[in-house]
């Protein structure tokens, strides 16, 4: 095995670990959400996340927390609160695999928001595949079905929140340290969550606290896995593997919750996956052309 192939496989391995962690988060959130309110889950998740990040703050020094954009961190925290509480609540009323397929639609929302907030010019083929992608989202959510539950739209609200976070990250992440972005967002989200969580408070059991700690620490762990992966392979090289998360979710949901995706979820995935792949690769080409022209 040559060095290039070894580096590629190692990078993909790190990326797959991030997918496993992400699926585990959804499973844990769904399990916790059956008893604890999504506001309380969000509070503990980000409270523990901020605790886990403290050793890194000490290691890198207090200068790593210096920021010239406090309002950006507050905005990220508010979006995280809204996104994660909506996502956790959605998991309590819909299968894990439905959540996974909806998460694949986030690049579609990001593309639209980029037009308004980043002044990006979008070529017409990307608009076409975006429309097709949203058709896939409609197929997944089945708003036309007799048993349609409108509360499943919380997933869509969460996806929009996460897309807005992507826009903010694109604009500001290169100007702030990663530790400060993670730490301040976790602190703000925990603070915002606490007052509303107290209205629905149920004291977690020891086992639930352990799961909440795992949930809080895994967010940073996912980022670590992704950074390791992207240090070895290009982000577009990992794109096709992103959709293995659906396979992981199907297996986990079946064995833990006895869930299996319905035909609409699978049909929606078949539509959404190629459209988002097209967007990812076309964005990469656009970035390459931009760098070549500079």
UniProtKB/Swiss-Prot annotation:
InterPro entries noted in UniProt: EamA_dom
Family: Belongs to the drug/metabolite transporter (DMT) superfamily. 10 TMS drug/metabolite exporter (DME) (TC 2.A.7.3) family.
Keyword Cell membrane among UniProt keywords: yes
UniProt name for this protein: S-adenosylmethionine uptake transporter
Subcellular location: Cell inner membrane
Domain called EamA: residue spans: 21-141, 160-280
Keyword terms of this UniProt record: Amino-acid transport, Cell inner membrane, Cell membrane, Membrane, Repeat, Transmembrane, Transmembrane helix, Transport
Primary role: Transports S-adenosylmethionine.
Any single Gene Ontology cellular-component annotation: plasma membrane
Protein's gene: sam
SUPFAM superfamilies registered for this protein in UniProt: Multidrug resistance efflux transporter EmrE
Segments crossing the lipid bilayer: 8-28, 41-61, 74-91, 98-118, 121-141, 148-168, 177-197, 207-227, 237-257, 260-280
One Pfam family per UniProt: EamA
A Gene Ontology BP annotation from the UniProt entry: amino acid transport
Main location: membrane
Topological type in the membrane: Multi-pass membrane protein
């Amino acid at each position: 095995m040559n060095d290039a192939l070894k580096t590629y496989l190692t990078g993909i391995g790190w990326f797959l670990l991030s997918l496993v962690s992400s699926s585990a988060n959804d499973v844990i959130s769904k399990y916790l959400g059956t008893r604890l309110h999504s506001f309380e889950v969000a509070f503990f998740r980000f409270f523990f996340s901020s605790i886990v990040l403290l050793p890194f703050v000490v290691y890198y020094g207090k200068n790593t927390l210096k920021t010239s954009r406090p309002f950006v961190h507050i905005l990220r925290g508010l979006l995280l609160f809204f996104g994660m509480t909506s996502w956790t609540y959605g998991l309590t009323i819909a299968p894990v695999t439905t959540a996974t397929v909806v998460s694949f639609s986030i690049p579609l929302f990001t593309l639209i928001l980029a037009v308004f907030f980043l002044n990006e010019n979008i070529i017409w083929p990307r608009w076409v595949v975006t429309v097709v992608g949203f058709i896939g989202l409609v197929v997944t959510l089945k708003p036309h079905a007799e048993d349609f539950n409108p509360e499943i739209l919380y997933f869509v609200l969460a996806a929009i929140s996460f897309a807005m976070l992507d826009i903010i990250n694109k604009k500001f992440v290169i100007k702030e340290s990663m530790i400060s972005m993670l730490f301040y967002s976790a602190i703000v989200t925990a603070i915002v969550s606490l007052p509303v969580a107290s209205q629905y408070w149920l004291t977690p059991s020891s086992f639930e606290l352990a799961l909440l700690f795992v949930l809080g620490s895994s967010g940073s762990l996912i980022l670590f896995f992704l950074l390791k992966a992207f240090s070895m392979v290009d982000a577009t090289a990992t794109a096709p593997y992103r959709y293995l998360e659906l396979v992981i979710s199907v297996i986990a949901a079946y064995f833990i919750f006895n869930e299996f995706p319905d035909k609409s979820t699978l049909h929606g995935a078949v539509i959404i996956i190629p459209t988002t792949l097209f967007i990812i690769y076309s964005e990469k080409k656009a970035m390459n052309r931009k760098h070549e022209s500079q």
